[in-house]
Amino acid sequence: MKKKIRLASVLFMATLFLLACTSPETAEEQNENIHIVTSMFPVYEITKEIAGDQADISVMVGANEDAHHYEPSAKAVASVNEADVFIYSSDEMEFWVESLLAVVENDDLTVVESQG
């Protein structure tokens, strides 16, 4: 009888030890930053200043590219599909945004026009 109690106690203690050593959150759960895609570099810079380290921010049109003549690549469309927020300047500045959003399949995407 004492052996059974001792064995049960050891198993119980081992279980508690293992449970105490496990992490309740995975690395993905710990990184809860929102993913923001911006259309061009000035919008990226402003967004970066506002969001700080609370968001992962990427830019579609680089600093040395022309936003008027930009054509979104498949990689850019995929990036917007995976984003939480897409921020662009205006329809007049980036006429390609309308066609981009037409092919994006992310129903949870928040789209922000930063005009003005």
What are these regions (language model features)?
Residues 4-9, 20-116:
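Extracytoplasmic metal-acquisition and chelation regions
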Residues 12-18:
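Hydrophobic core
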